[in-house]
Amino acid sequence: MKQVQKGFTLIELMIVIAIIGILAAIALPLYQDYISKSQVTRAYGEMAGTKTAIEAALFEGRTPVLAATAAAGAAATPPNEWVGMLDNPTSNLLSAATLTPGANAGDVTFVGTLGENANSSIHGATITLTCTASGEWTCAVAAGTATGWKTKFVPSGCN
């Protein structure tokens, strides 16, 4: 009587493990890049949410300001107007934000720095939103101090 084989041979198991290893080696870097891009896009979205408040303040002739932390002390009193974000954001991705009036009336530059819990490849990157007096917004993302920065992390709608 012939014996029926039960289970797998050692070579079959080794081939399966090799295939899993190859797939993991390809998938892990792609997943890390996906996480980095989604975090940059989320931080951009958090910053872009203040654009309407900034435009409203500029339209009313006020100076848009970020709510200062207790140590900074810049008051959001007329002619300043708070635009809904702190200079030390409570976001777990943005570690710092600055809102600076430009040289011309109505110009403003809003810069956010990725830090805190951002992926290590984007930690220290900056997102800059700039508004001109005509109300036109531009966006730029720079590596800053991020060591693993890739241009594919820039969100759509941002140059």
Swiss-Prot record:
GO terms for cellular component: membrane; pilus. One of its GO terms (biological process) is cell adhesion. Keywords: Disulfide bond, Fimbrium, Membrane, Methylation, Transmembrane, Transmembrane helix. It is a single-pass membrane protein. The keyword Transferase does not apply. It is found in: Fimbrium; Membrane. Pfam families: N_methyl, Pilin. InterPro entries: N_methyl_site (IPR012902), Pilin (IPR001082), Pilin-like (IPR045584), T4P/T2SS_Core (IPR050470). The keyword Transmembrane helix applies. Gene3D superfamilies: Glycoprotein, Type 4 Pilin. The modification N-methylphenylalanine is found at residue 8. The chain crosses the membrane at residues 8-30. Residues 1-7 form a propeptide. Disulfide bonds join 139-158. PANTHER family: GENERAL SECRETION PATHWAY PROTEIN G, PREPILIN PEPTIDASE-DEPENDENT PROTEIN D. Belongs to the N-Me-Phe pilin family. This is Fimbrial protein EcpA. The gene is ecpA.
